[in-house]
């Protein structure tokens, strides 16, 4: 049984079917991860190309992929895989809040009512930019103040299979929060169909 068959079997056991939402993260040379309402999994790269596995899942299930940005779709297209439908977290952020700033840290901050000006900056550590010794999980995706950690938002999510799995779970969480926000837009009832 190939890797794609094993993942497909897991999706069937989870009840994922045609058109169901499924968060997807692809990290070349690391693997891929999926998340859904009641679970997640990470598929490390061995000999299998993550795009190949996604292509087989697309053909068998045709889910609506939840992706952080269109970079995921671009990676798949470059590998010869075309997906039919996506929930692009960055694009939905633009529908909800306007503007063009839709990087993961900004999306997360807006959905969690955190000030954009307090988004942590990335870059090398210096006198005024040191790790917080009070952080509950110094390797986790979230800081104690609720913001995404700068290293994660800047690509550190792709460091290993465990991190890509967590990044997929966060994409699912953002999608769920965006769905709630869209439902609150009574004055624009058609916006949810655009998302």
How would you label these PLM feature ranges?
Residues 1-111, 115:
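Conserved RNase H-like, two-metal-ion catalytic cores of nucleic-acid enzymes
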């Amino acid at each position: 049984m190939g890797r794609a068959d094993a993942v497909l079997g897991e999706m069937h056991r989870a009840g994922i079917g045609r058109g169901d939402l499924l968060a997807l993260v692809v990290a070349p040379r690391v693997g891929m991860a999926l998340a859904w309402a009641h679970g997640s999994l990470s598929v490390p790269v061995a000999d299998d190309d993550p795009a190949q596995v996604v292509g087989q899942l697309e053909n068998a299930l045709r889910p609506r992929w939840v992706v952080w940005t269109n970079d995921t779709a671009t990676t798949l297209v470059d590998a010869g895989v075309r997906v039919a439908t996506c929930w692009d977290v960055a694009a939905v952020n633009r529908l909800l809040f306007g503007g063009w700033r839709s990087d993961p840290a900004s999306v997360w901050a807006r959905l969690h009512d955190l000030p954009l000006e307090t988004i942590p900056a990335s870059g090398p550590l210096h006198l005024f930019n040191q790790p917080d010794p009070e952080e509950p999980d110094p390797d986790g995706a979230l800081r104690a103040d609720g913001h995404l950690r700068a290293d994660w938002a800047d690509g550190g999510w792709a460091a290993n299979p465990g991190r890509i799995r967590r990044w997929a779970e966060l994409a699912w969480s953002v999608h769920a929060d965006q769905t709630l926000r869209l439902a609150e837009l009574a004055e624009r009832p058609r916006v949810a169909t655009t998302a």
